[in-house]
């Protein structure tokens, strides 16, 4: 019968490369946009939590004290970001759920912040492109610059103590401090086996509250290496002879690489359904879908064609952030088009790329009837989105449905919000791409 092959192309993962440039950052400057491509931003329940560093396409390294006792389902990771606020974007952002937290088993032993590292496994590999890249792990072949050569730390932490957090990513260059001097500064808290220090003896610069988990990087032979993970320091954050203390990545490298190599790959469930006749139904539909599902569906889109996904029926466990059960739609570049849960029957979603990737994930508790989707292909620029009916309820009358337009498309170089000039509907997520 011969063979049927498919070809996928991926950029080779190269670490430590940043653009050529002409916890808490005190006394630093605003970083040029996308100048530190491994910088991660962690949020919990919608609020900024900590920084982190992308060390593998699926792995972010952060501080253990940032995620201690937290569930992976409530932590969100953003890569390629510059602004602290999620309302301000630069266009290179990639958004991720966390599926696993691996905290160092000896965190807080023997000192309070010993072994202050944790690994976050992302829900999918990051796309290594504009503004998103890997940092190299510290390498023993390079001698550390304890002679005063500066390294750099970055973050959205406080600009002073007490003081506000940064609205944009900040950077500051700091010299590494020898273990002897660090021990002199912190005779009771410093652990030379798991910590490294950086800062100026005169003070005035350093990391602060909100920078925790972020990177301390040094350049060797044209590449940037992660030497430290921002951990702790003395308040206020800019005291003389009180450097910032970081988890020592070089000392902890074997733990980091060992945990990553032993972590099982995210497995796709064997009982996932299939796309048949341009239709996709969740496993078990119309009965309840199983718990603990992880299914990935790839829908190729022919050249000069765009895809409309119509939600004929859609009922998943609801949550304001879709933390529990969800369907996520991304394009071929890992750009998130939308994340959906709750009741979404009647919605239409436009995908204008070479492929649509649908990821269906469920948790271990409540479930619902699932979804029934249909796929329609149109010549590029000619897609029609069906109206999306949003249920509304009042306490005085029977629930009614109010038709509102779908997301629509750009036509004649014009784009109108759904419902314009009337009010746009609530709980709407629209993505428009202008080529």
Curated annotation (Swiss-Prot):
Recorded family membership: Belongs to the peptidase S1 family.
Originating organism: Acropora millepora (Staghorn coral)
Catalytic residues in the record: 65 (charge relay system), 116 (charge relay system), 212 (charge relay system)
N-terminal signal peptide: 1-16
Tissues where this protein is expressed: Component of the acid-insoluble organic matrix of the aragonitic skeleton (at protein level).
Domain CUB: 256-378
InterPro entries membership: CUB_dom, Peptidase_S1_PA, Peptidase_S1_PA_chymotrypsin, Peptidase_S1A, Sperma_CUB_dom_sf, Trypsin_dom, TRYPSIN_HIS, TRYPSIN_SER
Compartmental location: Secreted
Organism ancestry: Eukaryota, Metazoa, Cnidaria, Anthozoa, Hexacorallia
Xref: Pfam families: CUB, Trypsin
Coiled coil ranges: none
All residue ranges annotated as the Peptidase S1 domain in the record: 25-261
UniProt GO molecular function: serine-type endopeptidase activity
Entry keyword Secreted: yes
Positions of disulphide bridges: 50-66, 151-218, 182-197, 208-237, 322-341
Cross-referenced PANTHER family: ACROSIN-RELATED, HYALIN
Gene Ontology CC: extracellular region
Keyword Disulfide bond: yes
One GO process term, biological-process aspect: proteolysis
Record keywords, A-Z: Disulfide bond, Hydrolase, Protease, Secreted, Serine protease, Signal
Major place of residence: secreted
Protein name stated in the entry: CUB and peptidase domain-containing protein 1
């Amino acid at each position: 019968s011969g063979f049927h092959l498919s070809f996928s192309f991926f950029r080779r993962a190269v670490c430590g490369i940043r653009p050529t440039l002409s916890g808490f950052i005190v006394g630093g400057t605003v970083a040029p946009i996308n100048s530190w491509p491994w910088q991660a931003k962690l949020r919990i329940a919608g609020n900024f939590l900590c920084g982190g560093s992308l060390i593998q396409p699926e792995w972010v390294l952060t501080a253990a004290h940032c995620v201690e006792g937290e569930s992976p389902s409530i932590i969100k990771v953003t890569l390629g970001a510059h602004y602290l606020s999620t309302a301000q974007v630069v266009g290179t952002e990639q958004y991720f759920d966390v599926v696993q937290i691996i905290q160092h088993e000896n965190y807080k032993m023997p000192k309070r912040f010993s072994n202050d590292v944790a690994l976050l496994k992302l829900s999918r590999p990051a796309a290594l492109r504009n503004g998103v890249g890997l940092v190299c792990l510290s390498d023993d072949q390079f001698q550390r610059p304890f002679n005063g050569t500066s390294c750099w730390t970055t973050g959205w932490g406080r600009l002073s103590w007490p003081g506000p957090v940064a609205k944009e990513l900040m950077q500051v260059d700091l010299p590494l401090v020898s273990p002897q001097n660090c021990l002199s500064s912190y005779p009771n808290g410093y652990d030379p086996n798991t910590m490294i220090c950086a800062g100026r003896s005169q003070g005035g610069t350093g990391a602060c509250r909100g920078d925790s988990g972020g990177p301390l990087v040094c350049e060797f032979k044209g590449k940037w290496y992660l030497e430290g993970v921002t951990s702790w320091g003395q308040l206020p954050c800019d005291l003389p002879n009180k450097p910032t203390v970081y988890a020592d990545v070089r000392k902890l490298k074997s733990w980091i690489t060992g945990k990553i190599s032993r972590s099982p790959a995210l497995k796709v469930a064997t009982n996932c359904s299939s796309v048949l006749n341009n239709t996709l139904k969740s496993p078990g539909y119309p009965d309840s879908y199983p718990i603990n599902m992880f299914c990935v569906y790839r829908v190729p889109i022919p050249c000069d064609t765009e895809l409309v996904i119509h939600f004929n029926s859609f009922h998943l466990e609801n949550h304001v952030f879709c933390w529990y059960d969800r369907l996520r739609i991304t394009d071929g570049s890992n750009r998130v088009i939308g994340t959906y849960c709750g009741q979404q029957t009647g919605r239409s979603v436009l995908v204008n790329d070479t492929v649509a990737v649908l990821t269906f994930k469920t948790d271990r508790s409540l479930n619902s009837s699932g979804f029934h989707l249909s796929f329609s292909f149109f010549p590029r620029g000619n897609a029609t989105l069906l109206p999306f009916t949003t249920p509304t309820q009042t306490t005085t009358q029977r629930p009614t449905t109010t038709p509102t337009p779908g997301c629509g498309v750009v036509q004649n170089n014009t784009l109108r919000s759904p419902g314009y000039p009337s009010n746009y509907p609530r709980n709407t997520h629209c993505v428009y791409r202008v080529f």
